[in-house]
């Protein structure tokens, strides 16, 4: 991690890795890392054939951006739609949703929560394994 004026530069080697049975997430910007409190920003990897169960984020909006891989996105309990690289999904606060990797490779996503908060709750999910920074 490197300070740059009042900003911060982080890499995945600088932050915790939170692992689940469906994949992993690393938050490159969150209150505990960069002091940002209006949003958190993370990189998600969904394992082949896996995804996270239907859930919501009370009080926080979410944007998901697909970097690579193919999947299905459900929002508001509507039938899931196919998503792939370049897709951006906006999810209003409190709305139930899920993402499943349906492709033949790891699905990489960027997630942003506003305001920050869901990143703390993810660490408390039963079965979550938090690995300290590698760097």
Task: Please provide the spans of the model-predicted regions.
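A short beta-to-alpha transition loop/helix N-cap that caps and shapes the active-site region
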Residues: 117-123
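A short, N-terminal "cap"/entry segment at the start of jelly-roll beta-barrel domains
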Residues: 1-39, 53, 124-135
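A generic "binding-loop/recognition-motif" signal
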Residues: 50, 59, 70, 79, ...
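Short acidic-glycine-tyrosine-enriched beta hairpin
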Residues: 77-93
């Amino acid at each position: 991690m490197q300070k740059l004026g009042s900003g911060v530069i982080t890499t995945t080697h600088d932050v915790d890795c939170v692992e689940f049975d469906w994949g992993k997430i690393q938050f490159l910007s969150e209150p505990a890392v960069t002091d940002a409190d209006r949003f958190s920003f993370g990189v998600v990897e969904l394992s082949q054939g896996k995804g996270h169960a239907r859930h919501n984020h009370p009080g926080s909006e979410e944007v998901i951006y697909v970097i690579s891989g193919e999947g299905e996105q459900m929002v508001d309990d509507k039938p899931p739609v196919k998503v792939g690289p370049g897709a951006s999904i906006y999810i209003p606060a409190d709305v139930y949703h899920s993402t499943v990797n349906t492709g033949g490779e790891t699905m990489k996503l960027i997630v942003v929560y506003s305001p920050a908060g869901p990143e703390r709750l993810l660490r408390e999910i039963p079965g979550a394994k938090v690995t300290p920074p590698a760097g």
